[in-house]
């Protein structure tokens, strides 16, 4: 049990980060008409949009994915990408999703992340799943 579900825009920053993690992962489609349904618990990784406020921070595709009750019931945590140029609002999508889905905001990284971010997330995700009840 260690699935990563992620959304990445055409910039591919989040996609490159997830690829470097080397963990099992599925991507939420860019095309909003395509639907993804998952059948196991997962950690969601999303970029943050907008200027640091909550309105528009979460990508529409991620909202649509989480509006599926089945998918929403399986989220266990969130990691957000952002840009420090937005000050305190960087990585805001993680705050929004953590609050609305009642899951922990596990980590945030800037743009494509650094090698330290990759190592921290890889280790943190492994430890997170080890702490989860096996029947979830």
Curated annotation (Swiss-Prot):
GO terms for molecular function: FMN binding. InterPro entries: Flavoprotein-like_sf, RNR_Ib_NrdI_bac, RNR_NrdI. It holds the Pfam family Flavodoxin_NdrI. GO terms for biological process: protein modification process. Gene3D superfamilies: 3.40.50.360. Belongs to the NrdI family. HAMAP family: NrdI (MF_00128). PANTHER family: PROTEIN NRDI (PTHR37297:SF1). Probably involved in ribonucleotide reductase function. This is Protein NrdI. It comes from Klebsiella pneumoniae subsp. pneumoniae (strain ATCC 700721 / MGH 78578). The lineage of its organism: Bacteria, Pseudomonadati, Pseudomonadota, Gammaproteobacteria, Enterobacterales. The gene is nrdI.
């Amino acid at each position: 049990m260690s699935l990563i579900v992620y959304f990445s825009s055409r910039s591919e920053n989040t996609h490159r980060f997830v690829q470097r993690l080397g963990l099992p992962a599925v991507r939420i489609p860019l095309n909003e008409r395509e639907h993804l349904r998952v059948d196991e618990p997962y950690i969601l990784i999303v970029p943050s949009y907008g200027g640091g406020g909550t309105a528009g921070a979460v990508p529409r595709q991620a909202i649509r994915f989480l509006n599926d009750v089945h998918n929403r019931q399986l989220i266990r945590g969130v990691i957000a990408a952002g840009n420090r140029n937005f000050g305190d609002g960087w990585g805001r999508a993680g705050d929004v999703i953590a609050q609305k889905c009642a899951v922990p905001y596990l980590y945030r990284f800037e743009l494509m992340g650094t090698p330290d971010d990759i190592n921290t997330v890889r280790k943190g995700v492994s430890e997170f799943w080890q702490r989860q009840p096996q029947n979830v």
